[in-house]
Amino acid sequence: MRLIRFLILFPFFLFPHADDMYLLKGGNVFLPNVGFVKKDILVDEGLIISIEDEIDSSVSENVINSDGKYITPGLIVFSALGLIEIGALPETIDIRSETYNAGFDPSDAFNPFSQAIRLNRSKGVTSTVNIPSASGYFAGLLSYTKINNGLKQKKQAPLGLLTSYGQSYDDSRAANLMFIEDLFSYVRNGYDSTKADQIQFFYGTDNEYRFTKRDLEAIQKVISKEMPLVVRVNKATDILKVLEMAKSENINLVLWEANEGHMVAEEISKAEVPVIMDPLNNIPGSFDSLNATYENVSRLHSAGVKLAFYYDQSSGAHNAYLATQSAGNAVALGVSYNEALASVTSNPAEIFDIKNVGVIAIGYDADLTIWDNDPLELMTQVETVFIDGSKQDLSNRYDELTERYTKEEELPNSYRSR
């Protein structure tokens, strides 16, 4: 064992002063299927290259004493980070489209300098699954983006195609199922992407839903199982219909919200369909959610459903990091601690097959967050964040404003420029 450990570390003794090599020493490390274990982590060239009980400090000049600290994978949130700055100003909103629906990918408009990104990064978030909101039958494509400092971010897209089923449409639920069955049949059997005259497909006498070539190509990826269909649905009977539709169409499915999922938890589990949800969403905001309850998350968890958590989407992008509060409350509601933390780290990556992130393991991207205490506790603070092995700037406008207006100066606050 000593020989193997020496062989692993030998190359790093040859270059002990590499600027991008970090040794995280003595932290409580959250490991897959284990939980927190005291370990040393060696990071180099953006990757986790060693996890040991003890790594000699001489391998790197960048040693971070993590004794008593908690080290987790960076948080993966579901949000509009980098795509919305102020919800009340349309010019700062890039998640919407009137031209495209199924083929709409808002990630091309990602703004890495958004103040919301700085805030969330300082709270332990290292990446986001971007949530679209196009105006057609489909909301658009989900995509994955890291939120590191600088102009270049790693992206993975598309992850899935988002739509809704239930009360969100004026037409009958039955008609909506017929519509999607007809649309899938058209794409599967009649659509030829090589023909110029197939550039648009209009459905219905009023042409209410328009599909461009780009949209139809996105739907084709769902049919060929290159990505899942993500359905925002809440009513128990609607959930069953969506499960039945996915089985008959032979497509991969992810449920979003599922406020009445607890009523059909066994059926969701048997179908092996994951659920993305806010554990605190217990208010019957519509007739689709009359049976919403705090017990939803614990019943789904007990049934064996894979879960991923987000914080209330209506709060905008700035508060996406509060997914840790959702996870902490899920523990109080009956979800195991390890599974709750996985629901904001590894589970989003597994659900959407996001490569090399979400867990602390050798060969994975060094997206790491160091906390001063239990990461699901409300008062815990983030001390250090790594994205792709690069130590991140954790300054944010909230802290800058606090520093400005709590500093004693000769002139009143109104005279301050900085």
Predicted stretch roles:
Residues 1-9:
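Sec-dependent signal peptide recognition
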Residues 8-17:
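Hydrophobic h-region of N-terminal signal peptides that target proteins for export
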Residues 27, 39, 362-405:
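C-terminal cap of metal-dependent C-N hydrolases
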Residues 29, 33-72:
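Histidine-rich, glycine-flanked metal-binding segment
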Residues 87-88, 92-96, 101, 228, ...:
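His/Asp/Glu-enriched, well-ordered alpha-helical/loop segment
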Residues 121-253:
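Polyanionic/metal-chelating signatures
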Residues 202-293, 372, 381-397:
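Active-site core of metal-dependent hydrolases
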